Amino acid sequence: MGQKVNPIGLRLGINRNWESRWFPVKSAIPENISEDYKIRKFLKAKLYYAGINQILIERTAKKLRVTIVAARPGVIIGKKGSEIENLKNEVVALLKKDVTINIKEERRPGSSAQLAAENVAMQLEKRVAFRRAMKKVIQSAQKAGAKGIKISVAGRLGGAEMARTEWYLEGRVPLHTLRAKIDYGFAEAHTTYGNIGVKVWIFKGEVLQKGIQAEKTDEAPKKSRRSRRGR
């Protein structure tokens, strides 16, 4: 089960919080869901190169607040805050209601699964070899303190005639352990040979009563594993 489902959705309410936080009356639920989708789709497309990790949406009776967690907040804010004001006006025009936008910096972009997936996808679009792109992201995640990382790429890798899936695994990624804090990200690389899907799982530690704790290090370090599946 843990291998198939989205690890973030599986852990909601356990060690992950919702990214849309509001409690409306029943009749307003479809409209709010539609607005949340429009906001995320618009911001992801417009601010793709800002390295967006999360878009948090909070609603009260009369207010709508959007918090953007990005690796490069300066790209969003612009000189003297000019870009953020233009962005707010565009979102207001999209929804026809007042919106407050906050920007937060992602202090550890190397440990973000979504940013890692987008990094691999951008390298594939620049014709970088997929194995080289995957290994580079794995090294960045390990330097950022990740306990384990798994990257999977699927499609016509290297321009091959037949699509296949390849994945790398470093460390541990316990998908069945609900107390494990696992980040997940997905991105698509649009290449001349077709789309290549990129999935990334990053294991950050186990969430206990006192928060995330590092694992015991008295065991011998495990060797890296790589496997290929599929034709």
From Swiss-Prot:
Residues 39-107 form the KH type-2 domain. GO terms for cellular component: cytosolic small ribosomal subunit. GO terms for biological process: translation. Keywords: Ribonucleoprotein, Ribosomal protein, RNA-binding, rRNA-binding. InterPro entries: KH_dom (IPR004087), KH_dom-like_a/b (IPR015946), KH_dom_type_2 (IPR004044), KH_sf_prok-type (IPR009019), Ribosomal_S3_C_sf (IPR036419), Ribosomal_uS3_bac-typ (IPR005704), Ribosomal_uS3_C (IPR001351), Ribosomal_uS3_CS (IPR018280). Pfam families: KH_2, Ribosomal_S3_C. One of its GO terms (molecular function) is mRNA binding. Coiled coil: none annotated. It comes from the Bacteria. The keyword Nucleotide-binding does not apply. Binds the lower part of the 30S subunit head. Binds mRNA in the 70S ribosome, positioning it for translation. Belongs to the universal ribosomal protein uS3 family. Part of the 30S ribosomal subunit. Forms a tight complex with proteins S10 and S14. PANTHER family: 30S/40S RIBOSOMAL PROTEIN S3, SMALL RIBOSOMAL SUBUNIT PROTEIN US3C. This is Small ribosomal subunit protein uS3. It comes from Campylobacter hominis (strain ATCC BAA-381 / DSM 21671 / CCUG 45161 / LMG 19568 / NCTC 13146 / CH001A).
